[in-house]
Amino acid sequence: VGFKAGVKDYKLTYYTPDYETKDTDILAAFRVTPQPGVPPEEAGAAVAAESSTGTWTTVWTDGLTSLDRYKGRCYHIEPVAGEENQYIAYVAYPLDLFEEGSVTNMFTSIVGNVFGFKALRALRLEDLRIPPAYSKTFQGPPHGIQVERDKLNKYGRPLLGCTIKPKLGLSAKNYGRAVYECLRGGLDFTKDDENVNSQPFMRWRDRFLFCAEAIYKAQAETGEIKGHYLNATAGTCEEMIKRAVFARELGVPIVMHDYLTGGFTANTSLSHYCRDNGLLLHIHRAMHAVIDRQKNHGIHFRVLAKALRMSGGDHIHSGTVVGKLEGERDITLGFVDLLRDDYIEKDRARGIYFSQDWVSLPGVLPVASGGIHVWHMPALTEIFGDDSVLQFGGGTLGHPWGNAPGAVANRVALEACVQARNEGRDLAREGNEIIREARKW
C-alpha cells in the first residue's frame, strides 16, 4: 500500500490555523511576498516546511518518525497593512529541532534554506520569540550592564567612546598616541575600527602594546578606569583567541569582535573566553545592512540583536536615531529595550511581534555611533538614557584644536546634559541652550 508519491501542497501538512502555541516553541514572524498565483497559506506553509522537517514530496522515511512532533507549523497569517501581496506568516517550531546553546544551528534551521525558495518573491524574518527553555541553554553576554559598571566604577551616566580615525594607515605608535589623547581628555573608551585587524601597516601585537601603554598612562593621570576596544577579529578562531589571550595578559579591560563577519560560532567561543577571563566584549555589527536593509527581504536587525544577546557581547552598535525619521526612533528603541531589559511586552508599533522574557540573561549596552557630535548630546542622553555607550569618532578627532580638546568637549557636554536632566530640565526643548551654557565653563 505505502503512500502516494509526487509533488504535494505544503498547506495540507504545515498550515495549521487551529494550533495552540506552546511555551517552549520558538515562534517566528516572517514577512512573506508570494509569487503571483501562490496563495498566502501555501507560501506560509512552505516557509514552515522548508525551515523544519519538510521536503517537496513525501518520502518513505517520513514513516519512521513522528512528523506531528517535529514539524514547524504556520499557525496564523495576516496581510500587511498598506502593502500589496505581503503577509506576516507566524510559524511555531518545536524546541527539539534546535541544538542547545547554538545560535548557528538556530539560524541554519530557521533562515538557512528557505530564502531562495521559488514560491516566494521575497521573505524577511521580522522577529523571533525565544522561549526561556531555549535561552537558558546560552551563557549570553560575558558580564552584562551592572557588572560592567562595577568593573569600571562608572555610574549614573552613559559611557563615552571614540573610534580612532583615520581607521586605516596609522602606525601603531601614532595610533596609541591618539588613544592616549582621547582617554586623557575624558573619554571612557576608544575603539579599533571594525576593519582594523592585523594589516601590513599595523600588526595586531604592536597595536595592542601601544594601546595598553596609552590606557595605563591615561588611567594614572586621570584616576579613572579606561579601556580601548582591541579588535580580536581574525581569520581563524584560534588566531582570534590568541589575540584575546594577549589582551588579557596585558591587563586591559575589553576586547572587540565583528560578530557577523566573524560568525556566531567564533563569537560564542570568544564570549565564553571573555567571561572565564574577566574581559568585557564589545561587538561591532559590520555587514548588518547587507542582511537587514531591505524592507521586504532578509532579517530585521532586532533578530540579529536578540541572537547577539544569546551568543554573547557586552556592547553592540545599534544605530543613533538622531536625525532619522520618528518611526525609526520607535523601532530602534524597540530593539534597544530587547538588548537591555529582562522582559519586553509585545508592541507592534515598535516592531515587537512577540513578548520576550529573557529571564536572567544579562543585558547588553547599546552603542550609538556614526555621524554624531556634541550638539546631539542632549537628544542622545534623552533617547538612550544612562545604560548606553555614546561614540564620537569624527565628533572627537575632528575638533579644530585636536583630539584631547575634542574629548574634553564631549565629556563636558555629557556631564552638562546629565546634570540638567537630573535637575528636571527638558533636554529635548532646552538641549542647545544647555550645551551653550556648558561652553562657558
Swiss-Prot record:
Keyword NADP: no
One Gene Ontology biological process: reductive pentose-phosphate cycle
More info: The basic functional RuBisCO is composed of a large chain homodimer in a 'head-to-tail' conformation. In form I RuBisCO this homodimer is arranged in a barrel-like tetramer with the small subunits forming a tetrameric 'cap' on each end of the 'barrel'.
UniProt binding sites for substrate: N113, T163, K167, R285, H317, S369
Gene Ontology MF terms: magnesium ion binding; monooxygenase activity; ribulose-bisphosphate carboxylase activity
Assigned keywords, A-Z: Calvin cycle, Carbon dioxide fixation, Chloroplast, Disulfide bond, Lyase, Magnesium, Metal-binding, Methylation, Monooxygenase, Oxidoreductase, Photorespiration, Photosynthesis, Plastid
Keyword Metal-binding: yes
Name of this chain's protein: Ribulose bisphosphate carboxylase large chain
Family: Belongs to the RuBisCO large chain family. Type I subfamily.
Cofactor(s) the record lists: Mg(2+)
Cellular compartments per GO CC: chloroplast
Modified residues (N6,N6,N6-trimethyllysine): K4
Protein's cellular compartments: Plastid, Chloroplast
InterPro entries: RuBisCO, RuBisCo_large_chain_AS, RuBisCO_lsu_C, RuBisCO_lsu_C_sf, RuBisCO_lsu_fd_N, RuBisCO_lsu_N_sf, RuBisCO_lsuI
Enzymatic reactions: 2 (2R)-3-phosphoglycerate + 2 H(+) = D-ribulose 1,5-bisphosphate + CO2 + H2O; D-ribulose 1,5-bisphosphate + O2 = 2-phosphoglycolate + (2R)-3-phosphoglycerate + 2 H(+)
Residues marked Transition state stabilizer (site): K324
PANTHER family in UniProt: RIBULOSE BISPHOSPHATE CARBOXYLASE, RIBULOSE BISPHOSPHATE CARBOXYLASE LARGE CHAIN
Residues at the catalytic site: K165 (proton acceptor), H284 (proton acceptor)
Record text on subunit structure and interactions: Heterohexadecamer of 8 large chains and 8 small chains; disulfide-linked. The disulfide link is formed within the large subunit homodimers.
Residues found modified as N6-carboxylysine: K191
